[in-house]
């Protein structure tokens, strides 16, 4: 009996807390449908890795190292940045850049909405985090899970598990966070500004050249962003080339879903109680919220400044769609517009800003890598 149940004596209260956190993530995934393809495997993985002497992670037993499958997956897919890059192919294949190409000035707001990243970097440094850990935490503001994983892993951050949990949790909370912030920094009159939309035709040649040109420009400006932006744009090229419909469909659905599932399960190896239940995790939770809030504020404020000089006013709410949470943020902005005025349709404008934010967040991640590598 002791052989069967002796391991129970190795159980620590911190591990039980992690079981509760894992169960909470599973509940959020199923009941609230918050990023289920990632939070569900992450929650289950958190329980797996916090069982005493869990065979799911690498253990040293009687002087012999026994490799755990989750650690093997981590070394094979995250330590070498393979999973995030493959996921970028799927994301790129999902994105239609037509709203942005028909109104290129929207890219300004995608860039402005990255303000929270650099603001949070400064705050995290002041709070005592090492500059590379601060950069890894700040990139939560990209609202882009794969970029957060890529940057945090590149810098070998000690807080990878916490960063990923916080990043995806706040992405799922965009419909709650953004409306509150937007209402705080805009007036009723500004939120009611109507924007007409007349889609300008965009040639197939332009759609094909766009991912190539963006990759070249980003590579020249931020060389370390080439892997990130390159895989994202390659996915988009598969979508737009017109001769790889089957692969485009596979990348959008099968590849993206499978890699997201593996990411969630694999990242859980960094959610072991000893490294996760720390004061720093609570600080990362707060800093992640700061990053999201100031991303939103940055996009809105730049849109308001634009209105000072523009003949045709834009609704400043669309500036908030510049975060990379695609297409969730665009839908939030459109819903808010309709709540203020049931004839105020902002979806296509918001989508244009949202996809520009996808590009801007990846470039911002590359700039962080270039500056602090």
Could you tell me what each predicted segment is?
Residues 1-65:
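N-terminal alpha-helical transmembrane segments of multi-pass membrane transport
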Residues 214-302:
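Transmembrane helical segments that form the transport core of multi-pass membrane transport proteins
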Residues 97-121, 272-299, 350, 354:
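Entry/N-cap segments of selected transmembrane alpha helices
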Residues 1-11, 16, 62-63, 67, ...:
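Intrinsically disordered, low-complexity non-transmembrane regions of multi-pass membrane transporters
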Residues 166-243:
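Membrane-embedded hairpin module used as a gating/binding unit in multi-pass transport
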Residues 158-176, 287-293, 318:
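Alpha-helical transmembrane segments
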Residues 75, 79-80, 91-94, 109-119, ...:
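Alpha-helical membrane segments and immediately flanking helix-loop junctions
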Residues 7-18, 71-87, 132-141, 168, ...:
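Structural signature of hydrophobic alpha-helical transmembrane segments
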